[in-house]
Swiss-Prot record:
Residues 52-109 are annotated as: Disordered. One of the primary rRNA binding proteins, this protein initially binds near the 5'-end of the 23S rRNA. It is important during the early stages of 50S assembly. It makes multiple contacts with different domains of the 23S rRNA in the assembled 50S subunit and ribosome. InterPro entries: Ribosomal_uL4, Ribosomal_uL4-like, Ribosomal_uL4_dom_sf. It comes from Mycobacterium ulcerans (strain Agy99). This is Large ribosomal subunit protein uL4. GO terms for cellular component: ribonucleoprotein complex; ribosome.
């Protein structure tokens, strides 16, 4: 079965677009990264762990031992007809402590690197098979940032709301051009993760970033 799955995989070729809207060559997406079966259970596990690790875990409530006051018995033990009480700071009283409330804790989960990488490959493959992976030479022409130009360019690529843009760390022109656009999230190739890929409707790579991601995970590189 594994051999059949491997033989069914194939490299995908997509066009590379320039900021002027013209096609500037094409790139090949290696099958080992962009055409693997999507393991939904694995992706769910990895995303759950990633989101759990992002929690601060600083929540804290006061138990009856932490709340001030309540040292005196509110009324005598017998003869009142009421239930016996030893303190006004027990959970059933207003202003009392919280029973079984949250305390500071670490929510992070240990996830093996191979599982994280496999989940990312599955997420990217799902996007690639549905035509949701795009490649561009750059987001804006020249070295002057332009949010208007970047917005217009992205609109020619996709009309969907959530877009993940993957560009190099040194591409400050691109970062400044799209960082204020609603629905656009920016990552560098080494920050690419399953959660952000699945959250995005489309993933837009610069050729430089695509080269970097493929080089870090295979022995191949693409050229536009």
């Amino acid at each position: 079965m594994a051999a059949q799955n491997q033989s069914a995989q194939k490299d995908l070729e997509i066009q590379v677009k320039a900021p002027d809207g013209k096609v500037d060559g094409s790139v090949v997406l290696p099958a080992e990264l962009f055409d693997v079966p999507a393991n939904i259970a694995l992706m769910h596990q990895v995303v759950t762990a990633q989101r759990a690790a992002a929690r601060q875990g600083t929540h804290s409530t006061k138990t009856r031992g932490d709340v001030s006051g309540g040292g005196r018995k509110p009324y005598r033990q017998k003869g009142t007809g009421r239930a016996r009480q030893g303190s006004t700071r027990t959970p059933q009283f207003t202003g009392g402590g919280v029973v079984h409330g949250p305390k500071p804790r670490d929510y992070s989960q240990r996830t093996p690197k191979k599982m994280i990488a496999a989940a990312l490959r599955g997420a990217l493959s799902d996007r690639a098979r549905n035509g949701r992976i795009h490649a561009v030479t750059e987001l804006v022409a020249g070295q002057t940032p332009s949010t208007k130009s970047a917005k217009t360019f992205l609109a020619t690529i996709t009309d969907r709301k959530q877009v993940l843009v993957v560009i190099g760390r040194d591409d400050q022109t691109g970062v400044k051009s799209v960082r204020n656009l609603p629905g656009v999230h920016i990552l560098s190739p080494d920050q690419l993760n399953t959660y952000d890929v699945l959250r995005a409707d489309d993933v837009v790579f610069s050729v430089e970033a695509l080269n970097a991601y493929i080089a870090a995970n295979t022995s191949e590189e693409v050229s536009a």
